[in-house]
Amino acid sequence: MEPDVNRDQIPLRDGTRLEVRPIRPDDADALVALHARLSADSIYRRYFGVRPHLAPADVDRFTRVDGRTRFALVAMRGTDLVAVARYEGRAGHSSAEIAVVVDDTLQHQGVGRSLLERLVDVAREAGLDTLAADVLAGNAAMLALLRTLDLPQRTESDGDTVTVLVDLSGTALPAARRERARRHLARARSVAPP
């Protein structure tokens, strides 16, 4: 069966495909389930501390995006949410913070990279010019993932945390990637609260 060209998918090594789409409010339960499946180490690397449960206010904020200052892409395996890449900025600013989390069973298979590349494209299309990632200094996998973006970067460190600033103001996106980013933004904005 040929993949639908209007659907965004990430192929896995075993031949299955993950559907990529913007997060929606009705993903709340699936997001909580993903968090429950994460190892303590994955949670620590994502949130910089112990966080056994997501607070309802966080779930609400994480699943309600506006396609402008707040946006998130999810990777779905059937009805299971298996990865999230998000940015969150402030109104009137051209920068945003990013975060990525991938189900432990799918780490190191290119899912995080594929989602992050798409998130960067969406951020550029949304008019952002800088993305910032705060990463624990010992999180070599995330630091390596950010280096794969092939965009100008600057790093700052306070010893425990490395902040990677990614410059998005460079070259224009290829047409196919720009169109994919526009589709994701349009889908997110169509379900955004007024």
Regions found by a protein language model. Name each.
Residues M1-P194:
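Long, contiguous binding/interaction regions
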